[in-house]
Amino acid sequence: MKDGKERLRERIEGIDCRGQIAESRFRIICKGRLNVNELQKKMDVLQKITAEFNKDNLLWAIGASLLLYFKGVAEVFHDIDIMVDEKDVERCKNILLNMGTMGAASPDPQYKTRTFIEFTVDEVEIDVIAGFVIVDNGMEHDCSLKPDQITEFITIGKEHVPLQGLALWRQYYEWMGRTSKVELIDKFAEHKTGTGKGER
């Protein structure tokens, strides 16, 4: 018999599969607490990056706070977190260097991530993560990007932006000890699958 946690995970994965594309497009235009000009700038930068990454056939996806925003879980996001396949790091780096500037690395002992690079493109902060590793209670979890982790795409302008799964990031936040993020995702899943208010 499935426990509550397993049933909740299935509900979150179901949300991943069905997606929030139409709602996310509406949120970009009409909702959220971000300043409209600031939001437009971030979307313009994301569209520009997406065009170059996809043209160069990079394996990449959006994760973290921007993923939560696109899925309708969070109303704000601060930077653009990009997960990249390790073999594509150099090409990713070269593309972003042609668009903006690279910042200094700032390692965090909770992570043993093999590549973490900060960029600024048109005043928008970009975090590039490859070989993502989370350390939880002394155990290392390899969270490197894999093709099957891309569960859907959202369209920005004419560009198709790949998204990682919401259930996957719930697990990542749990390993990170980010309780508030886990609770936010759980409440969202409960709301979306509630009687009369969930997705069809």
Q: Where do the protein language model's features map onto the residues?
A:
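A short, compositionally biased
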Residues: 6, 110-115, 146-150
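Helical scaffold of the NTase/Pol beta-like nucleotidyltransferase catalytic core
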Residues: 8-12, 19-61, 190-200
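Catalytic cores of NTP-dependent nucleotidyl/adenyl transfer enzymes across multiple folds
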Residues: 29, 138-200
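Active-site nucleotide-donor binding segment shared across nucleotidyl transfer reactions
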Residues: 49-80, 84-86, 91-93
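Short, solvent-exposed loop/turn segments at secondary-structure junctions
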Residues: 67-68, 133-135, 168-169
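A short alpha/beta connector and helix-capping loop motif
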Residues: 93-99
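Conserved catalytic core of two-metal-ion nucleotidyltransferases
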Residues: 102-136
